[in-house]
């Protein structure tokens, strides 16, 4: 019985001591968190830059932009023509009542 009580007492003391030590542990302050964040972002940026230097990625990007340009050029031309026609109709409507 005494051994059981001693074991429980020892467990309680160790548990309290562990909680006390955790409270005394230094909490990371805001400055160190921001510094760590910027360091991580810098490392990520460097890795991304190294990957972007590869000719394969550049070729893929060039092909993507060329394909996009091929698809968008007719749409932009049509939109420009439609806009000019639309504005021309408004100008014609304004000039007709003035001439009558």
Swiss-Prot record:
Query: What tissues harbor this protein?
Result: Plasma.
* Record has Secreted as a keyword: yes
Q: InterPro entries from the xrefs?
A: ApoA-II (IPR006801), ApoA-II_sf (IPR036172)
What Gene3D superfamilies does this protein's entry cite?
Answer: 6.10.250.100
Q: Which residues form the signal peptide?
A: 1-18
* Gene Ontology molecular functions: cholesterol transfer activity; high-density lipoprotein particle binding; lipid binding
| Main localization, broad class | secreted
Q: Which domain of life is it from?
A: Eukaryota
Could you tell me the keywords of this UniProt record?
A: Cleavage on pair of basic residues, HDL, Lipid transport, Secreted, Signal, Transport
Localization, per the record, is: Secreted
UniProt GO BP: cholesterol homeostasis; cholesterol transport; lipoprotein metabolic process; positive regulation of phagocytosis; protein stabilization
Q: Name one GO cellular component term.
A: spherical high-density lipoprotein particle
Assembly description: Monomer. Interacts with NAXE and NDRG1.
Name the job this protein performs: May stabilize HDL (high density lipoprotein) structure by its association with lipids, and affect the HDL metabolism.
* Family classification: Belongs to the apolipoprotein A2 family.
**What name appears for this protein in its UniProt entry?**
Apolipoprotein A-II
The source organism is: Leptonychotes weddellii (Weddell seal)
Q: Which gene encodes it?
A: APOA2
């Amino acid at each position: 019985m005494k051994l059981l009580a001693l074991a429980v007492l020892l467990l309680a003391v160790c548990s309290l001591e562990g909680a006390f030590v955790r409270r005394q542990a230094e909490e990371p302050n805001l400055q160190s968190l921001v510094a760590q964040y910027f360091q991580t972002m810098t490392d990520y940026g460097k890795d991304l830059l190294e990957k972007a230097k590869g000719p394969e990625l550049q070729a893929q990007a060039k092909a993507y932009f060329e394909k996009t340009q091929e698809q968008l050029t007719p749409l932009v031309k049509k939109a420009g023509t439609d806009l000019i026609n639309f504005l021309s109709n408004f100008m014609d409507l304004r000039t007709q009542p003035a001439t009558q």
